[in-house]
Amino acid sequence: MATTASLFSLPPLRLGHRRLLPQTSGSDSRFQTLAAKKAAASTDAGPGGSGLLSVLDRKLTDEEEYRRARAQVQRKGVEAEGYGVEGISVGGHETCVTVPSLNVAFDIGRGPLFAVRQDNLFITHAHLDHIGGLPMYIATRGLYNLKPPTVFVPPCIKDDVEEMLQIHRRMSRIDLEVELVALDLGETYEIRNDLVARPFQTHHTVPSQGYVIYSVRRKLKKQYAHLKGSQIVKLKESGSEVTDTILYPEVAFTGDTTSDFILDPRNADALRAKVLITEATFLDDQVDVDHAREHGHMHLSEIMEHSQWFRNETIILTHFSNRYSLEDIRQAVNRLQPKLLSKIVALTEGFKSEYS
């Protein structure tokens, strides 16, 4: 996986775990040592040999599980259709997802450092685990002399967000420079000349909206396809528009939502974006679909139920409940139908392994 340049370097993740066997010297790993001891034990014909083999088998299995889980914990982001996606999304705790090549962040949770370099921030709704880090995000950009960010919010919360920032300005006696944009459903905002954003309707317990980021391409109008280059130049010089502007949905982000957004025909672009970043708060039968819907969230079973509507190349699942471990998430996702599973990536940063 390609790594994305970052303004900040994060400290290495320390994982605590029960040592299975004493550390060996030199280049031998604990895993190799266990394997060697198992091989040695297999030649032991004395009493109790089979018991020792059984213990070592269990330790080998534990070690393999630990190595897999550690690899999952250390993975800081994912690659999807040419886009590096970095983020953390733990249900009820914090959500912030960035796509650095597009210079965008979605939601700002606790204001993680990896989001600070993104100039454009899209807020889906006003719950603290999605917006709580906004003042710190703005302040940190100022601290590092980065230009004021552009922050997009649902129109119904703009005044409250501005009031919140004013309170922090008074308390902190700092400027908190920001361009705050109320972006409504049906509106389009140009991020740069080849990139635009549009919100779409989501369904949560408070007013909410998702966002689609589109690439902008221009194609010669059909009626001019037979003309030579010099003729097209003359038309352009005369003021004629010779191209059509076509928007291609690249990345969509839902934030918190029920599955109702899937069935809304106005959200077709979100369901055909190359990459859809959506939520799956609940994964198993400990919590049923009715409970998920009552709290404005999705159950993994609903993603399976509606899988025929997803035209995305990759679906990144986020916002799992903190009740789940890395192993719980992996096992639940692996139970999806093969065709759907081939599209799914689980964003598991922030989740613990049973072996850590």
Predicted feature descriptions by range:
Residues 2-45, 234-353:
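Cap/insert and terminal regions of metallo-dependent hydrolase folds
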Residues 26-120, 209-213, 219, 244-254, ...:
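Conserved beta-strand hairpin/beta-sheet module of binuclear metal-dependent hydrolase folds
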Residues 57-60, 90, 190-280, 284:
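Active-site-proximal loop/helix segment associated with metal-binding centers of metalloenzymes
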